[in-house]
Amino acid sequence: GMGGQSLRTIRNTEVRHLEEETKISQELIDSLKDSNRAVPIVGYQILGVAPQEYKIGNGLIVEPVGVQTDHIEARFLNIIAHKNMKENISQCCDSVPIEIAEDADDLIAPLALADAVLTPGEKRSGCVLVDFGAGTTTVSIYKNNILRHLAVIPLGGNNITKDICSQQIEEEDAEALKIRFAQAYIEPKENDDESKMYNLDGRCSINAILLEDIVEARLNEILDNVSNQIVLSGYENKLMAGAIITG
């Protein structure tokens, strides 16, 4: 599926003023969706769309077909990425050849992951799915069974490895030290042994407290960015199902 640092979501609103109070038809909804898809975004391409709600009068509804109104405001969340991303993937598949899905939504990796990992209850109650990768961390936020926000943070496990490398350790050994000894959280102790070393089969070693500090610092940076994305989404106090972590 399609992922990467350029993948993110932006909001858009399409409005229709009707000459008289009319029952909303599926054709009108399709027209609003087409207008949203046609909005130009310089340097980017719309890969998928998550309709949010439709504002009719003072209310917000998800299924507006059949409702009487003379004014409708459609709110969309567009999933975008650099223009050449889909083209590059298509060219790679053509050269193999591999048949790709016709529905672009099926190609968006975070959406496919959410469908595989999250329960309907979690999506309905509201949750944030955090996917820790090697080079990136992807944040997907759901509420009322609708994708509300998606962002890719350009930080991941590789950054921790590089931080360990800064201690004059080869990358392969740094990765092995991370996998074998690193922990996301360590219970504070009053009498930590400052001389304790983590040894990698005699090839290299690192002070245990130093490794813990390196990992903690980078993870705090990543989690601060995740927290910031939750705030930017506007749903920080509405995620009753909490956070689901994968990666």
Predicted regions, residues:
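A short acidic Gly-Thr/Ser loop motif
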Residues: G1-G3, L129-T136, Y142-K143, P154-N158, ...
